[in-house]
């Protein structure tokens, strides 16, 4: 770190639990963020401002006027533009010293597998179960830590799945791919704007702790937030030994 960086990140360096070594690890790290919507907006901006050295943002959508209520990484003049490019422009303005790659695509399973391989931490900020499960499978295969978030109406959740740790669960252990989950979308059910900011910020927090090597992460815990009542709930997670993605069923296959 040079003197200018020490000044930029000085409030991190003042933290005994963080300090220069952790900041150096953060500056050397690569985060893959899938989704530049409500969750991704908050996560991306805090990753950039905190000094995540390299950020790859993947999103195949374009900015719509209805997005601006909660997707704060985009601006009014971004309407109609690719979300990945719009987000990258904002991040570059926040922190020009980091490397930002914008991928304007809907990454399928094979593409996600390749992208995950090159990352140190993966943030799932997507809005559908098919993508979430594809990201999870890639993270399990590559043994990369996954920070998963979701938010709809007034309810949000965040969890960390880190199979580098013995006994850790994966996303499929919690939400089986064939469990007939309903696809709940903001377009039909609505979403409270600050909710996705809260969850996305927590995703950034967990990702930073993972790559910087500080504190205890949410691995093994699911945090649920009820924004209407401002209540938090914690659910303990355990690996499903018969999980088709990370358990015995996968090994048998």
Can you say where each PLM-predicted feature lies in the sequence?
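Adenine nucleotide-associated cytosolic modules
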Residues: 1-253
